[in-house]
Amino acid sequence: MENPFASREKGFGNYSDFPTEQMDGLSSNFGSGVRNLISDDMFNPSSELMNFDSLAAWCNSPSATDILFAQYGLSNSQPMPFGAFTSFHVADPKATSLTRSFYDLESSYYGEERSSAQEMNSQFHRSSDSDELSGKRRKVVNQKIGFPNVLNCTIPRSLSHSLDEKMLKALSLFMESSGSGEGILAQVWTPIKTGDQYLLSTCDQAYLLDPRFSQYREVSRRFTFAAEANQCSFPGLPGRVFISGVPEWTSNVMYYKTDEYLRMKHAIDNEVRGSIAIPILEASGTSCCAVMELVTSKEKPNFDMEMDSVCRALQAVNLRTAAIPRPQYLSSSQRDALAEIQDVLRTVCHAHKLPLALAWIPCRKDQSIRVSGQKSGENCILCIEETACYVNDMEMEGFVHACLEHCLREKEGIVGKAFISNQPFFSSDVKAYDISEYPIVQHARKYGLNAAVAIKLRSTYTGEDDYILELFLPVSMKGSLEQQLLLDSLSGTMQRICRTLRTVSEVGSTKKEGTKPGFRSSDMSNFPQTTSSENFQTISLDSEFNSTRSMFSGMSSDKENSITVSQGTLEQDVSKARTPEKKKSTTEKNVSLSALQQHFSGSLKDAAKSLGGETSAYFQAWVYFFCPTTLKRICRQHGIMRWPSRKINKVNRSLRKIQTVLDSVQGVEGGLKFDSATGEFIAVRPFIQEIDTQKGLSSLDNDAHARRSQEDMPDDTSFKLQEAKSVDNAIKLEEDTTMNQARPGSFMEVNASGQPWAWMAKESGLNGSEGIKSVCNLSSVEISDGMDPTIRCSGSIVEPNQSMSCSISDSSNGSGAVLRGSSSTSMEDWNQMRTHNSNSSESGSTTLIVKASYREDTVRFKFEPSVGCPQLYKEVGKRFKLQDGSFQLKYLDDEEEWVMLVTDSDLQECLEILHGMGKHSVKFLVRDLSAPLGSSGGSNGYLGTGL
């Protein structure tokens, strides 16, 4: 059918006069249904239709106003000012016919009988004096508040006509409350029926105009938008608001994509910045009947003032808009749970430099009141609980304010996805969402937010009430590896500080022997709703599954080829659903401890390959070989935090270092021997014997089960000597009865920054036969692991010399802090001394080939290890143009894991690994630091350290 509000204005053109991209946002299949909304027969004597756009009170086009006066015989000798908002009051017979034509239009559209001209004219005050008419017109022209007198007539009108009249009055009141209205365009979008479809159009509707937006108003009149859900893919801003019934705004339309704001090009050309669309509802109804759109010429942080003015104006005409649900009264248990959530979010934000963390609560709408505890359902919405949120970066407060004004539904954003799946959900870039998937994405783009993770928790305080925590990673962290490391660290921090918060587990999951509360990996494709509080998994520090990688196990992701987490290890997911992972989960559950023990003597890789083959053959299905990461996860489930053979290799390397030192001791005939059974040095043999692998495994395995170390398998890069010696944690030097007793003497200060153990005697009056004039230079790794530096000699305790100094790499606290003491022996001195040592070939002094990668760039150069770790950082920084202290290096070790390189001791360890592998080249990964290195010993902060 023809649009009943078709314009009769000449000079405004029709759809054929404009490019097709300006028409509307409907799909191509609706093109045939869209009629020409502007007719060419404006001079048709049988119809004197004139819409609101023709009224001088609301239209600012000079040509249109001239036509208006000419058509109805009005004098246009005195030009109408267009620089301000004006009103045109009906005051003469011909003007009355203009008004009558509008009501004729309304009556015709809704099937009412048209009133006769005589009946219409009798209801208006007319003047036969042309001078009086002219004077009244001049008087009205100078007024700023525009609301025509036609609204005072008493002709019966239809409901739709009443809505138009109300919107005119509401715009008038809005202009009064907002001042001059400078820099504002306000226009109303109402549904019209075109064929079998309803479209939103602002043509022939009331509007409020600033002159600078006249062209944009003309463009808007030529657009139509979908008024029904699923009618088209791109409903545009008015369409989205009409369908959802929720206000939507942006401080700048540039934060929209082109298909989200279909008039983007025209908005840019006309300097449109801020925009808000407000749904209009009848006072007694809940369905949206119109949309009011406001655009501004200035970028606005929010539309609070405009929203308040519009609400008051609508209330005055018995209309309303959708209100933001206010929170219900919180019980004491809810306040306790929210207080703990805020403490957790505050700690996490400070420790890991997160910009902000939000807490969402599922609610239902009950007369504009949020009622928490609502389960998944049709009326469920997710609302921000402001009292539990924490903003670490004050610039992000505007984003929190925007979230407060907009509730999310199920499946919207990572919060909605985490809510329905009971699984943590991760997005590497929330800005990439479409506005239909994440309704506040325009605000996320404004503040530059990137990666975020959401997790659903419950509290023992509130039973089955759900809380969804949304954590935003630092905006500068865009690399997948950086995000992986931070998520692992986040997991450990949250497990340590959460007291009553619990994650929701899958209903019906069977508890296996040895299973403790914690985050477990499970099938991501099916997560039924939890029905009992017993189906919780407590985040507990003393849990057997408190690995820093288990927090986000089984986490889902938003895109293909994006980062996903499986038991804490981020991997590149080549498919959203991989059938082999289900088989892998079943296979993992059937690897027993006895099966693992049979492979302890071999390497981790060989054991993974062997166990995978055996298991798949047992099940006679889908040949699968475990990767080392999978086997590590299985070991942790059995309480094995480190593969035993690697411990033995570490012990042997350390003992070889000790043997090098002992062989250089003067005055001990035949050298010293370290007895692994007693933990003592015995001067009976000229060499030290490596620990037998099988014998060492039996003792270390029992010790490992008893200790239940808190460290992850790949993170444990330190060697604890006390695992291979007696309980007293001391080194005993048992001298032979023929040896002289040690006499007091002076000791030379030595460098302990991770170099091989050295015994050095200072020049003094005592010769070698008089006693041992040396000092034990303890490795920084052993000291940081809590080893007692006290040295026992012949049953008497000898404290280390007070002048002794060392460089300690505090890798145990995860901060990578370097605490350096004074040292009189440098790396160069040690290298000079090493050249005279018979065992110098073990460490090697050949040139090292370095291959470093930073983001998309890779460099290769030769490096002399003797210059030390600081020089290596300088060489890498010089090639990538990075400042000192702004990046960190990690090298690929013999188990293909990335290990931090911070100090010279780390470099020496790297060289030894390369020597054992027979290689002379090393790969380095360069990663940016979000904060300078350094923290207190007890800090759990994420300050650039990795696994």
Curated annotation (Swiss-Prot):
A Pfam family reported for this protein in Swiss-Prot or TrEMBL:
RWP-RK
Q: Where is the composition biased (Low complexity)?
A: 805-815
Q: An example Gene Ontology cellular component term from the record?
A: nucleus
Q: Where is this region: Disordered?
A: 114-135, 509-533, 550-591, 805-828
Q: Which GO terms describe its biological process?
A: regulation of DNA-templated transcription
The PB1 domain, residue ranges: 847-929
The task this protein performs is described as: Probable transcription factor.
RWP-RK domain location, by residue?
577-671
* Superkingdom of the source species: Eukaryota
Record's compositionally biased regions (Basic and acidic residues):
126-135, 573-587
Q: What is this protein called?
A: Protein NLP8
What does the UniProt entry say about where the protein is found? Nucleus
**Which keywords are on file for this protein?**
Coiled coil, DNA-binding, Nucleus, Transcription, Transcription regulation
Matching SUPFAM superfamilies, A to Z?
CAD & PB1 domains (SSF54277)
**Record-linked InterPro entries:** NLP, NLP1-9_GAF, PB1-like, PB1_dom, PB1_NLP, RWP-RK_dom
Q: Where is the composition biased (Polar residues)?
A: 522-533, 550-572
Coiled-coil residues? 646-666
The Swiss-Prot or TrEMBL record annotates one GO molecular function as:
DNA-binding transcription factor activity
Q: Which PANTHER family match?
A: PROTEIN NLP8
